Amino acid sequence: NPQTSYGTQKVIGEYLVTDLTRKGYLDGRSLRLPTIVVRPGKPNLAASSFASSIFREPLNGVVAECPVPERTGIWLLSPRKVVDAFIHAHDLASSAWGTSRVLNLPGITVTVSEGVAALRRIAGEAVAARVQHKPDERIDRIVQGWPVRFRTPRATALGFAADPDIETVIRDYIADEGIRVR
């Protein structure tokens, strides 16, 4: 039940994949992704950009501005796990999908305060202090409309997995990017 034009566009794409699969033109699979954290690269203009920035920028010596309250929860999945999910979706037999070709991937819910606390435990106070709260009502209004918890029993039954915790997500980003901490 999409609540935005963006969500409507995504559902239209999912329906097309399902319909073309039903007609035998392709063997399609549509994955609904949580917010991907920690994305490498630079911040962008997406409302979700802060979710990676509050980790990525401080670990790279740069101040990050967090536009939402510390209590804000984010449903997330790491780049490693999303790559694993795409490979797993490809490798699953067509029969495993049945007639439903759309799947919400598992993820974990982390609040901004939990994420910053994990960053502090891993990289120290000086790094965590680079996260500065600068409220942005426009972004906050968008983010507060996002669900923060999903039940994904079908995905789990098909072998898809979430990250175990935010500490693992942060440590994997540090390892993947070759960042030295402490």
Predicted regions located by residue number:
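A short C-terminal helix-loop "cap" of Rossmann-like NAD(P)-dependent dehydrogenase/epimerase domains
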Residues: 36, 52-67, 124-132
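Active-site Tyr-X1-5-Lys
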Residues: 3-29, 60
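Amphipathic terminal alpha-helices
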Residues: 133-135, 147, 152-157, 164-182
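Short-chain dehydrogenase/reductase
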Residues: 2-11, 44-52, 75-76
